């Protein structure tokens, strides 16, 4: 090879090297441009734009590609403003959106979080990349606490709670909180371990486990987790509910607790329990000091270690103490002694226990009781509740027979509300029987059963006898009163003779006369709208003989025809009066108005017609009310519900 050829070859090689080093316009390698991000939520429609806005003519021929593993997979073509999907996974979800080459991707899923490429060939070849970013908010986080508890003496980390956030995209971030403060990883104190699972839908399920060492002060701590995630609209977060974790620690102190709190009295439902500052509560025993031996003796409790005093009595008073045994540490703890006081009032006694006195004499009643507190006494009349006096002594002077009966002595403790005891005593006033009524009238229906009653009082308590046969029953409202009820058949003889009840005791006797009045049943006329009968009454008055008693009078019966005749007569009188006034008016003898006679045109007179209709729903016995006390008839307007139609 000659020298000229070597020189030429050298120059050619140098030119090639220089071209390669310096580059030639139009032949340099273009770097991949930064893709345009498009954010969309799962289930919505994403709009993929092919670069900046240009006239529609610039996109007469466009191709869309999916970038998958550095390969360009065609998915859509645009030619002359018309689009066509390529077969594949996007075949049925892509469409043109408006003029140009903007694609609408419907029903976005997490699998669509990819890079897309738009290639346009006019006016010059141009590539435009779009990065589709898909988001989905996770569900509300759930949290599960450790229910078995964590012992403070264990040195290794124990699981506190587990937080789960389901169906989010992309993977949310989890933050743990204790009492509102975020927890950070801390060696030998706090550890957070998170894992995620990809569901078939492409969504993520996040699981985070919080482990920690707890101390006694964490027994009331509130733990919860927070999920932080992003949406196209911005950053969001969701919090779980708060949970507490049982913290186990040994007891250091034990004490006695009594319910109810405050002053106790006999009859209360009292509960005694033992408590400690440890968790869980250890096994307890409740002991009470024996006042005789001064030794503590164990009391019987239920399965929960509760001692129930139901009802509390004065012998339940005393000194109580709790003891606890920690089975893990075998440490025995004892509480401070607690003195329980059950306030009481002993059985009330009245002296004399069965007082008896002659009418007109005086009587002194004395009430006694015992209590651990100061007492107050009150005297009441049992029958009426009337307060007779205060103090342990009740003095009754110049007693009357009405003073006989039961009295109450109430012994109470003012300092302990509701603590009182009562004693009843019956006072007997010597005397012959006295009757509730000397004479009574009872309405009866013949051949019907009737109850006759008789009441008498006295001391000694009287007995009652009847002068007629029947079934008698007795009861005693108080120790010196007796009430007898006799069930008899009303016969004509009984209506004629009546009945007598006699009360007698060792001091005398007394009688009540019962007069029977016959009640007749009256039926309304057939045109009446109702038919009413009068039932036989049972009369049992209890008014005293010296009081004014009012006997019920049955209305007298009167024929309904008399009422109708009275109405017709009154109607005729009114008609005649009206005709007379009209006659004087026509003759001009009756001035009309202040200006004298005025002409009034009346319709032609017709033959007078009187139509009288009387309607009444009154009972026959109520019709007797139409009759005055002197036998005069009342005006028709007072005779109940009726109307009169007068036609002229």
Curated annotation (Swiss-Prot):
Predominant cellular place of this UniProt entry's protein: membrane
Stretch list, region Disordered: 282-304, 527-554, 626-648
Start-end of Basic and acidic residues biased regions: 631-648
Keyword field contains Phosphoprotein: yes
Extracellular topological intervals: 24-560
Signal peptide residue numbers: 1-23
Pfam families in alphabetical order: C2-set_2, ig, Ig_3, V-set
SMART domains per record: IG, IGc2
Residues annotated as transmembrane: 561-581
Phosphoserine: modified positions: 608, 616
Classification via InterPro entries: CD80_C2-set, Ig-like_dom, Ig-like_dom_sf, Ig-like_fold, Ig_sub, Ig_sub2, Ig_V-set, Immunoglobulin_dom
Disulphide bonds in the chain: 50-118, 163-225, 274-322, 367-409, 454-501
Segments of skewed composition (Polar residues): 527-549
Keywords carried by this UniProt record: Cell adhesion, Cell membrane, Disulfide bond, Glycoprotein, Immunoglobulin domain, Membrane, Phosphoprotein, Repeat, Signal, Transmembrane, Transmembrane helix
Sequence ranges on the Cytoplasmic membrane side: 582-648
GO molecular function, one term: laminin receptor activity
Residue intervals of the Ig-like C2-type domain: 246-332, 337-426, 432-512
Chain's role: Plays a role in cell adhesion, and in cohesion of the endothelial monolayer at intercellular junctions in vascular tissue. Its expression may allow melanoma cells to interact with cellular elements of the vascular system, thereby enhancing hematogeneous tumor spread. Could be an adhesion molecule active in neural crest cells during embryonic development. Acts as a surface receptor that triggers tyrosine phosphorylation of FYN and PTK2/FAK1, and a transient increase in the intracellular calcium concentration.
UniProt name for this protein: Cell surface glycoprotein MUC18
């Amino acid at each position: 090879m000659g020298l000229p050829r070597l020189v030429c070859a050298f120059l050619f090689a140098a030119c090639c090297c220089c071209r390669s080093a310096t580059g030639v316009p139009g032949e340099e390698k273009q770097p991949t441009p930064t893709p345009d991000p498009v954010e969309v939520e799962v289930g919505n429609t994403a709009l993929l734009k092919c670069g900046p806005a240009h006239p529609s003519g610039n996109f007469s021929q466009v191709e869309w590609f999916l970038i998958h593993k550095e390969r360009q997979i065609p998915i859509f073509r645009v030619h002359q403003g018309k689009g066509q999907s390529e077969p594949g996974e996007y075949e049925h979800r892509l469409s043109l959106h408006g003029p140009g080459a903007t694609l609408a991707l419907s029903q976005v899923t997490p699998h669509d979080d990819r890079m897309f490429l738009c290639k346009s060939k006019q006016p010059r070849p141009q590539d435009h990349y779009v990065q589709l970013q898909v988001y989905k908010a996770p569900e509300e986080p759930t949290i599960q606490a450790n229910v078995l508890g964590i012992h403070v003496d264990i040195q290794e980390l124990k699981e506190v709670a587990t937080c789960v956030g389901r169906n989010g995209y992309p993977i949310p971030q989890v933050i743990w909180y204790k009492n509102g403060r975020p927890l950070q990883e801390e060696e030998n104190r706090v550890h957070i371990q998170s894992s995620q699972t990809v569901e078939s839908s492409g969504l993520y399920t996040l699981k985070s486990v919080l482990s920690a060492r707890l101390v006694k002060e964490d027994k009331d701590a509130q733990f919860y987790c927070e999920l932080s995630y992003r949406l196209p609209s911005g950053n969001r977060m969701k919090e779980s509910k708060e949970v507490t974790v049982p913290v186990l620690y040994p007891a250091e102190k034990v004490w006695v607790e009594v319910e109810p709190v405050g002053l106790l009295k006999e009859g209360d439902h009292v509960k005694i329990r033992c408590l400690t500052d440890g968790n869980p509560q250890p096994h307890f025993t409740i002991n009470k000091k024996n006042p005789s031996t001064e030794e503590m003796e164990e009391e019987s409790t239920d399965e929960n270690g509760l001692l129930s005093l139901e009802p509390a009595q004065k012998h339940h008073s005393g000194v109580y103490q709790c003891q606890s045994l920690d089975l893990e540490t075998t440490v025995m703890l004892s509480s401070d002694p607690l003195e329980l006081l059950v306030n009481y009032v002993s059985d009330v006694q009245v002296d004399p226990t069965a007082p008896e006195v002659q009418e007109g004499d005086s009587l002194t009643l004395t009430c006694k009781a015992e209590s651990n507190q100061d007492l107050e006494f009150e005297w009441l009349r049992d029958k009426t509740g009337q307060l007779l006096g205060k103090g342990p002594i009740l003095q009754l002077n110049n007693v009357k027979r009405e003073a006989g009966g039961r009295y109450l002595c109430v012994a109470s403790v003012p300092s302990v509300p509701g603590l009182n005891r009562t004693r009843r005593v019956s006072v007997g006033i010597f005397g012959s029987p006295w009757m509730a009524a000397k004479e009574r009238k009872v309405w009866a229906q013949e051949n019907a059963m009737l109850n006759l009653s008789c009441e008498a009082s006295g001391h000694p308590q009287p007995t009652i006898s009847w002068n007629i046969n029947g079934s008698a029953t007795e009861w005693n409202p108080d120790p010196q009163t007796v009430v007898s009820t006799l069930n008899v058949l009303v016969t004509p003889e009984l209506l004629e003779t009546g009945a007598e009840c006699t009360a007698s005791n060792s001091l005398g006797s007394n009688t009540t006369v019962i007069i029977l009045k016959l009640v007749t049943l009256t039926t309304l006329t057939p045109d009446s709208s109702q038919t009413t009968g009068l039932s036989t009454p049972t009369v049992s008055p209890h008014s005293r003989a010296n009081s004014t008693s009012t006997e019920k009078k049955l209305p007298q019966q009167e024929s309904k025809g008399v009422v109708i005749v009275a109405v017709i007569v009154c109607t005729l009188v009114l008609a005649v009066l009206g005709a007379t006034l009209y006659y004087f008016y026509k003759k001009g003898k009756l001035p009309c108005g202040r200006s004298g006679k005025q002409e009034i045109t009346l319709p032609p007179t017709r033959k007078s017609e009187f139509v009288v209709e009387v309607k009444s729903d009154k009972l026959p016995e109520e019709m007797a009310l139409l009759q005055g006390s002197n036998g005069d008839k009342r005006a028709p307007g007072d005779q109940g519900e009726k109307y009169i139609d007068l036609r002229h």
